[in-house]
């Protein structure tokens, strides 16, 4: 039997690795589009600044062809290079297009009419057509310029430093558009605005040279539609990663933005590794996870086998990215998302409520994270030389903070299908409920819950762990998640315990919600509760022995 299991594990791993071809193999050749890329061999800042504006206008032009836009993008990203002729050769590696370099000496004064070099293969009609395209901006571009400020294009640029500041300000906006061009291009631009603000604060982006939002959108669309451009940008990202600490401004900027681009489309895979395998908690030993753990092992080996380009699978449209989809390991993905939703507040921005998300294993992750937050890693504690008293102090500190965090309903179940704003209601929602005094005998053997300032708080069990069993449920989905775990609570939705009385070997609990009051009896030491009486709230009011009256109408 063990040989069969080893063979299955080896088969699963080889299944992920065997369908890859050798690195550098040439794919079957298909039809290629001819792309003209304009090259300037002079370091003249005025000419290069004119080429920068010319490329922006070609990208935004409403009558340009796809090849015109691709050539303008490659020329735009190559402008900081001292030798554009050699730098553009990076694009020659693409099997998608035939790159044709056209050397340009400059522009006619006051126009965007090209002055070609004698070696450039450009006809007079093509030169006139490019000049018309540069002036043919769509009506969605205001003031006849891609920039927010209308006078930016006409400003003189006679110093290399001026050109580099303007060029880097434009290119950094184009690179920010690359971040979401393949994974979330249709999402609101809040993340892009935050990155623009970051680079303005760092001095890498001058606000005066900001492009109009429509121009930024057209650049992003052009990058998204062109595999040639994205392959070229991937080579640039790899060059930036290889740079040392002493690097030029451009590749330092590209390396910084590359951190937002790396592993895009693989978020679910890396979050699963972080919160499922990284925590090393006991639920990983469940038999249901055995096959999926083997799957994760094979995916980690595949990622290493792909090499440096594995970080840019989404940017390259590589088919291997489908192997990392969380639908291939749904149970352990659900468990990891439950753990992450408790440990990491940034998980609120990640959409993990997929159709294959298993609510039961998600809740296992939630409960495990809540109960294990105060545990101490013995290996790390030994390395730090912590005494048993110090370890207990750390555990008690975390438990105390977890109980008193006060984010709405303490210890309430996390529901992946409800927005976080609805889940984390402030404690003030119970301000209209007076604090009911509990009897002296309010500590249940089974982990009851008490009141503090009118809000129910989880009880502390032996070992410093927090008991979340007697918590109110907020919606049917949450009740469904908790029902197989705690049926004695889930059968009374939206309830609050308002009285717990122990007398004569019996323990009585009184619950109420908006329509009824329910009385449950349980013999001390028993595990089940018996329904004693249900009273409509609208016709009943009662007085407690403490002297506090509560009208339930």
From Swiss-Prot:
The lineage of its organism: Viruses, Riboviria, Orthornavirae, Negarnaviricota, Haploviricotina. Its main location: virion. Disulfide bonds: none annotated. This is Nucleoprotein. It comes from Mumps virus (strain SBL-1). It comes from the Viruses. Belongs to the paramyxoviruses nucleocapsid family. The modification Phosphoserine is found at residue 439. GO terms for molecular function: RNA binding; structural molecule activity.
């Amino acid at each position: 039997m063990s040989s069969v299991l080893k063979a299955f594990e080896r088969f699963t791993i080889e299944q992920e690795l065997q369908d890859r071809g050798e690195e550098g193999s040439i794919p079957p050749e298909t039809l290629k589009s001819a792309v003209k890329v304009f090259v300037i061999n002079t370091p003249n800042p005025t000419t290069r600044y004119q080429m920068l504006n010319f490329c922006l206008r070609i990208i935004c032009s409403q009558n340009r062809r796809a090849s015109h836009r691709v050539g303008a993008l490659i020329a735009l990203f190559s402008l900081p290079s001292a030798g554009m002729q050699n730098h553009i050769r990076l694009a020659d590696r693409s099997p998608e297009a035939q790159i044709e370099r056209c050397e340009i000496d400059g522009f006619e004064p006051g126009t965007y009419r090209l002055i070609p070099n004698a070696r450039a293969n450009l006809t007079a009609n093509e030169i006139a057509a490019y000049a018309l395209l540069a002036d043919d901006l769509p009506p969605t571009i205001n003031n006849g310029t891609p920039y927010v400020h209308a006078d930016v294009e006409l400003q003189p640029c006679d110093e290399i430093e001026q050109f580099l500041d303007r060029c880097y300000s434009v290119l950094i906006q184009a690179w920010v558009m690359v971040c979401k061009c393949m994974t979330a291009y249709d999402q609101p631009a809040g993340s892009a605005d935050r990155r623009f603000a970051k680079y303005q604060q760092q001095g890498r982006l001058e606000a005066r040279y900001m492009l109009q939002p429509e121009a930024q959108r057209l650049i992003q669309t052009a990058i998204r539609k062109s595999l040639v451009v994205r392959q070229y940008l991937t080579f640039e990202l790899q060059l930036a990663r290889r740079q040392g600490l002493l690097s030029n401004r451009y590749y330092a900027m590209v390396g910084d933005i590359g951190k937002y681009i790396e592993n895009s489309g693989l978020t679910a895979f890396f979050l699963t590794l972080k919160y499922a395998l990284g925590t090393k908690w006991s639920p990983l030993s469940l038999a249901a996870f055995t096959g999926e753990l083997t799957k994760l092992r094979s995916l980690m080996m595949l990622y290493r086998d792909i090499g440096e380009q594995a970080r840019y699978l989404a940017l390259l449209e590589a088919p291997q990215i489908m192997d990392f989809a969380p639908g291939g390991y749904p149970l352990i993905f659900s468990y990891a998302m439950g753990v992450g939703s408790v440990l990491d507040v940034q998980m609120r921005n990640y959409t993990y409520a997929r159709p294959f998300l298993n609510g039961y294993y998600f809740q296992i992750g939630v409960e495990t994270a809540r109960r294990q937050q105060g545990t101490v890693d013995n290996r790390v504690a030994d390395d730090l030389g912590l005494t048993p008293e110090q370890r207990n102090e750390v555990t008690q500190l975390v438990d105390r903070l977890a109980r008193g965090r006060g984010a709405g309903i303490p210890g309430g179940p996390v529901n992946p299908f409800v927005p976080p704003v609805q889940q984390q209601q402030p404690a003030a929602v119970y301000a209209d409920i007076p604090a009911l005094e509990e009897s002296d005998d309010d500590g249940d053997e089974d982990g009851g819950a008490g009141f503090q300032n009118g809000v129910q708080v989880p009880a502390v069990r032996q070992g410093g762990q927090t008991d979340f069993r007697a918590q109110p449920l907020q919606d049917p989905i949450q009740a469904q998640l908790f029902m197989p775990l705690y049926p004695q609570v889930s059968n009374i939705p939206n309830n609050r315990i308002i009285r717990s009385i122990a007398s004569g070997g019996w323990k009585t609990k009184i619950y109420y919600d908006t329509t009824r009051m329910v009385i449950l009896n349980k013999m001390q030491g028993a595990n089940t509760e018996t329904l004693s009486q249900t009273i409509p709230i609208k016709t009943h009011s009662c007085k407690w022995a403490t002297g506090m009256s509560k009208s339930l109408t």
